[in-house]
Design a protein with these regions (language model features):
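Generic detector of contiguous secondary-structure segments
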Residues: 52-60, 122-131
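Conserved G/P- and acidic residue-centered "switch" motifs that form tight phosphate/ATP-binding loops
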Residues: 11, 104
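Short coil/turn segments at alpha/beta junctions that flank glycine-rich nucleotide-binding fingerprints
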Residues: 103, 120-123
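Extreme N-terminal starter segment of soluble prokaryotic enzymes
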Residues: 1-3
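Short polybasic/polar patches that bind polyanions
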Residues: 101, 118, 140
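C-terminal "cap" of GNAT-fold acetyltransferases
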Residues: 89, 123-136, 140-145, 149-175
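Acetyl-CoA-dependent GNAT
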Residues: 6-10, 17-30, 34-99, 110-112, ...
Length: 175
């Protein structure tokens, strides 16, 4: 059974492991291999420790735990970082270990994230995803509407990201 709960500071190492492992499996063939090999559990742990300790950042983070209380997925976000009206919030990151994908965990994480946005007074959100990432279909299945695309550089390669948006996140919390 998978449990979804708010993240705590002590979750930083578990979140970091899911973050790094998910990048390595999900983005193989998309992001340069050297970049993926250089990802560090310790650097990601430090990053997540800082995020989870910084209350002023208003970062919303939830984790998915298995029966052994190991973190197998997480979602994080907050206010839209690039101010893309009419979107108030941004889902910055959602990752689930490959062996746990396809079990509805992603939908549950998005739902709890959207519920927290609504409690915080934010009714709309967007997210960015690599154009080559097959998970785009997941966001489309949740009703995400294509907004725009942008190019950026990572590990010496130019990649394309696409933004999906929800003008009313309440659709994500309905049964």
């Amino acid at each position: 059974m998978i449990t979804i709960r708010a993240a705590r500071v002590e979750d930083a190492p578990g979140i970091a492991k899911v973050h790094v492992d998910s990048w390595r499996t999900s983005y193989a063939g998309i992001v340069p291999a050297a970049f993926l090999e250089n990802l560090s559990y310790q650097r990601r742990t430090n990053l997540w420790d800082d995020i989870l300790r910084d209350a002023e950042r208003e970062h919303i983070v939830y984790v998915a735990e298995n029966e052994e209380q190991e973190i197998v997925g997480f979602v994080g976000g907050g206010r839209d970082r690039e101010h893309n009206p009419p979107y108030e919030a941004e889902l910055y990151t959602i990752y689930i270990l490959q062996e746990y994908q396809g079990q509805g965990i992603g939908r549950r994480l998005v739902r709890v994230f959207a519920e927290q946005l609504l409690r915080s007074g934010m009714r709309s959100m967007l997210l960015w995803v690599f154009a080559q990432n097959p998970s785009r279909r997941f966001y489309e299945s949740l009703g995400g509407r294509y907004i725009k695309s942008a190019q950026f550089e990572i590990g010496g390669a130019t990649l394309e990201e696409v933004a999906y948006g929800w003008e009313d996140v309440s659709v994500l919390v309905q049964d």
